[in-house]
């Protein structure tokens, strides 16, 4: 029996009809405010799990498990699964769904009802994030997980294609921006797969992609991450402005910004979209004028 067949034998996957029936019985309709789009193709979810290269020692974190489509695929593959769900009804329904469809591994699931953007602790230390992320919180959710949970060594996330391109973009490309640079503080992202809009219910208006991010050590030991991120935010608050003007508020004045830009070995006429993470680190470390 194949790995997929074995998993399906012990954890019955959710198809489109199953998810619609669960939604009907729970009185749930997909909520745009939570960016809810449920995957109805188990094959896509198995691919996501393979991209994560899970082991029996992993403690997985899933954000927005919904009715449990991905949860059912992950449970047989990991030691423990921490599922963070903001929707109160879905958080209450999920454990029973897992008990009925995956009884052999139901005790591996821990459901946390809450907002991932406000999470400070979890019942265990996650080693990997695997999730079909709600479209409206994908970028801040990934950054939050890397910031708060240093034990996470890798993530595999499904996000809309535009977000995936922003996360993986290089300097000078149209998709390059604050998310691209901030993510590089934690690791390197790459697109590992494409996903059709047809595998979701309700069907979104955009295509999706799967992104893998592997954590790397901080680029420069001892550098204040918050200080670097503050410069990045200032540079991209007005994306098309030259650094001298874009950083004037951050530095205190346009003249002060120019002096710090020059001290960092950059040009006042440069724009943030052309700078690397190393450039922003030098800017943050450049001494302020007296």
Swiss-Prot record:
Its EC number is 2.1.1.182. Keywords: Cytoplasm, Methyltransferase, RNA-binding, rRNA processing, S-adenosyl-L-methionine, Transferase. The keyword Repressor does not apply. It comes from the Bacteria. Coiled coil: none annotated. GO terms for cellular component: cytosol. It catalyses: adenosine(1518)/adenosine(1519) in 16S rRNA + 4 S-adenosyl-L-methionine = N(6)-dimethyladenosine(1518)/N(6)-dimethyladenosine(1519) in 16S rRNA + 4 S-adenosyl-L-homocysteine + 4 H(+). InterPro entries: KsgA/Erm, rRNA_Ade_diMease-like_C, rRNA_Ade_Mease_Trfase_CS, rRNA_Ade_methylase_Trfase_N, rRNA_adenine_dimethylase, SAM-dependent_MTases_sf. It is found in: Cytoplasm. Its main location: cytoplasm. One of its GO terms (molecular function) is 16S rRNA (adenine(1518)-N(6)/adenine(1519)-N(6))-dimethyltransferase activity. It is an enzyme of class 2 (transferase). Belongs to the class I-like SAM-binding methyltransferase superfamily. rRNA adenine N(6)-methyltransferase family. RsmA subfamily. This is Ribosomal RNA small subunit methyltransferase A. It comes from Acidothermus cellulolyticus (strain ATCC 43068 / DSM 8971 / 11B). The lineage of its organism: Bacteria, Bacillati, Actinomycetota, Actinomycetes, Acidothermales.
């Amino acid at each position: 029996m194949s790995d997929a067949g074995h998993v399906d034998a012990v954890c019955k996957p959710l198809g489109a009809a199953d998810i619609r029936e669960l939604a009907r019985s729970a009185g749930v309709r997909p909520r745009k405010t939570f960016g809810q789009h449920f995957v109805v193709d188990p094959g896509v979810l198995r691919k996501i799990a393979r991209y994560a290269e899970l082991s029996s020692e992993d403690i997985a974190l899933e954000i927005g498990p919904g009715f449990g489509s991905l949860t059912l695929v992950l449970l047989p593959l990991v030691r423990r699964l921490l599922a963070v769900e903001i929707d109160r009804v879905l958080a209450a329904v999920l454990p029973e769904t897992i008990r009925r469809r995956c009884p052999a591994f139901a005790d591996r699931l821990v459901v946390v009802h809450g907002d991932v953007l406000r999470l400070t602790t979890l019942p265990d230390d996650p080693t990997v994030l695997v999730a079909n992320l709600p479209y409206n919180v994908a970028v801040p959710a990934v950054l939050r997980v890397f910031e708060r949970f240093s034990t996470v060594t890798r993530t595999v996330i499904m996000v809309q294609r535009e977000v995936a391109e922003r996360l993986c973009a290089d300097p000078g490309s149209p998709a390059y921006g604050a998310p691209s640079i901030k993510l590089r503080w934690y690791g390197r992202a790459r697109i590992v797969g494409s996903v059709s809009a047809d595998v979701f219910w309700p069907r979104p208006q955009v295509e999706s992609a799967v992104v893998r991010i592997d954590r790397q050590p901080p680029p420069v030991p001892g550098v204040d991450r918050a200080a670097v991120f503050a410069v990045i935010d200032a540079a991209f608050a007005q994306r098309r402005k030259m650094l001298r003007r874009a950083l004037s508020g951050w530095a205190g004045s346009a003249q002060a910004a120019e002096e710090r830009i020059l001290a960092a070995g950059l040009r006042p006429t440069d724009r943030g979209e052309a700078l690397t993470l190393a450039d922003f680190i030098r800017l943050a470390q450049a001494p302020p004028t007296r």
